[in-house]
């Protein structure tokens, strides 16, 4: 059997308490029983060691100093002739707390190697054989519970010293605070302060993304192609999915509100409240059109409860009482391609002098700059890497609509002064509107130019906008000469000639007017008018379909008001017999059908078909079975329609006002306030 190099018993004895070589040294060596137990029971039985603790141990001579004594010099390994391996130690080990031994000097358990960190000299460390009462407890210099930064330092300390696993007071400061529970607290004053934890960080312009509760259908799956011409699917009874999503998203945008501290910081401006920031860019200082830092908000009017768009000009000071006179002229203009101005006023709600303009609000509207040049304002946008280049058909549509807006503006003796890609919004499919009209008239009221000159500037800005869209070049980097040459190669000569007419100054013999412009593009005006008519026909057809759905809804409300009238249980004239009993069974026939296995049948086609036949009153007979399956009725839809009209007529008479007023007292139902809209 192989033997080890060192005897384990001798090595353990050397580490614990080295035995003196001679009896001459025992009188100065303190007995270990005194250190461990406080007394030695062999003191009077021949123990050769010293038992007097007050007697200090003399400083050992250099010749008798032990190799592994705590007072020995720090071990420094000799330099090897061979290159040593590079050691890797944590950078945080240098800042570790100095270890002070508790009772005895910490002696190494083996021979140190070249890879170990040098032990600092223990010059001020108390001797291992000094008084126990004078020994200092281990106290770390700094408590750091970050495992990522203090892992190396913590590894050099003895974790078993003064550790109580059931005491958490030392780490209480590092533990997270208890989460606020709004349901367990009776005091709800802290609900607002703790409510921000349930939402993302409230930044400027942040809007809540929690959708409202839309109780709308969500069709799943494609259309069936194996239907016969006389067959219909569920989709045929409702509006198209894309139109429904568009309307639903606009409703969602209209109902969005700000949350957290951002909502509390929004003031009430005049008669407008619940302000929501609509700006999509944080670069406010680049507003070169107005010359002021502008902000756009969505707000609710306190007078009409309608939504409006507010544009704020920060730091504008009104120096003339007549500066708001142009607003009256702009409020008279009504055009399908102009965002109508509602009001203008000054406010100090933000602590400065700001000028506010109120316009009509169109949810999910985006500017031409955002739609066609998304990368110009978003350097790291998640949208498409290429701009949305407008085709020539779309360009002619824009030209016709802007011409329509200019015709309405110029005919009233005004100038648009806002034909810019950042001030023209898209509110529908290729439907654009001029926004911010009239703001420059208020700002430059004291520096007004002749109206003919301002209208001429409208034509020039109009031409530059079309060139920018045709060449897919942002307005800031547009080289007009090269852009027109490029447009001539990619587009028709008619479009190029129209743009040159807009950019060139008028001839000496005449003046440029919108009528002259419309006369030159009359062919494209007819094309745009035809597209508008077809769009109107499509919307009307969808409206007709929803009217049919409204008829079904009114019939359902009548059936719901007739069935299960508990307040008339004791009324002999309103007992569930005869016609009313058949209506109750008809409800089960339409909505409570089951299959052969007793599972509910959910067939929208069956429900709509039965309700439509009931609304018309056909002669078709159906069999109504009682719930106990003992009685059957053969009735026609015409008879059921008469029963509905008769029973509902009695309810109208009993209401007292013919419009669904309060029911019999003591029923427990809420009192309904009639209005002119309560018509069936």
UniProtKB/Swiss-Prot annotation:
Gene Ontology molecular-function annotations: ATP binding; poly(A) binding; protein kinase activity; zinc ion binding
Biased amino acid composition, Basic and acidic residues: 52-64
Pseudokinase domain: region residues: 256-522
Assigned keywords, A-Z: ATP-binding, Coiled coil, Cytoplasm, Metal-binding, mRNA processing, Nucleotide-binding, Zinc, Zinc-finger
Record InterPro entries: Kinase-like_dom_sf (IPR011009), PAN3 (IPR030844), Pan3_PK (IPR041332), Prot_kinase_dom (IPR000719), Znf_CCCH (IPR000571)
Gene Ontology cellular-component annotations: P-body; PAN complex
GO biological-process terms attached to the record: mRNA processing; nuclear-transcribed mRNA poly(A) tail shortening
Biased composition (Basic residues): 670-680
Any coiled-coil regions, as ranges: 523-561
Biased composition (Gly residues): 655-669
Binding site for ATP: 311, 360-367, 422-423
Zn-finger region bounds: C3H1-type: 25-54
Region (Disordered) location: 1-26, 51-87, 99-120, 655-680
Biased composition, class Low complexity, residue ranges: 99-117
Positions of short motif PABPC-interacting motif-2 (PAM-2): 62-82
Pfam family membership, one: Pan3_PK
Region (Knob domain): 562-680
Domain of life: Eukaryota
Gene3D superfamilies associated with the record: 1.10.287.3700, 1.20.5.5160, 6.10.250.3160, Transferase(Phosphotransferase) domain 1
Family per record: Belongs to the protein kinase superfamily. PAN3 family.
Domain description: The N-terminal zinc finger binds to poly(A) RNA.
Function: Regulatory subunit of the poly(A)-nuclease (PAN) deadenylation complex, one of two cytoplasmic mRNA deadenylases involved in mRNA turnover. PAN specifically shortens poly(A) tails of RNA and the activity is stimulated by poly(A)-binding protein PAB1. PAN deadenylation is followed by rapid degradation of the shortened mRNA tails by the CCR4-NOT complex. Deadenylated mRNAs are then degraded by two alternative mechanisms, namely exosome-mediated 3'-5' exonucleolytic degradation, or deadenylation-dependent mRNA decaping and subsequent 5'-3' exonucleolytic degradation by XRN1.
Subunit structure: Homodimer. Forms a heterotrimer with a catalytic subunit PAN2 to form the poly(A)-nuclease (PAN) deadenylation complex. Interacts (via PAM-2 motif) with poly(A)-binding protein PAB1 (via PABC domain), conferring substrate specificity of the enzyme complex.
Name of protein: PAN2-PAN3 deadenylation complex subunit PAN3
Organism: Pyricularia oryzae (strain 70-15 / ATCC MYA-4617 / FGSC 8958) (Rice blast fungus)
Upper lineage: Eukaryota, Fungi, Dikarya, Ascomycota, Pezizomycotina
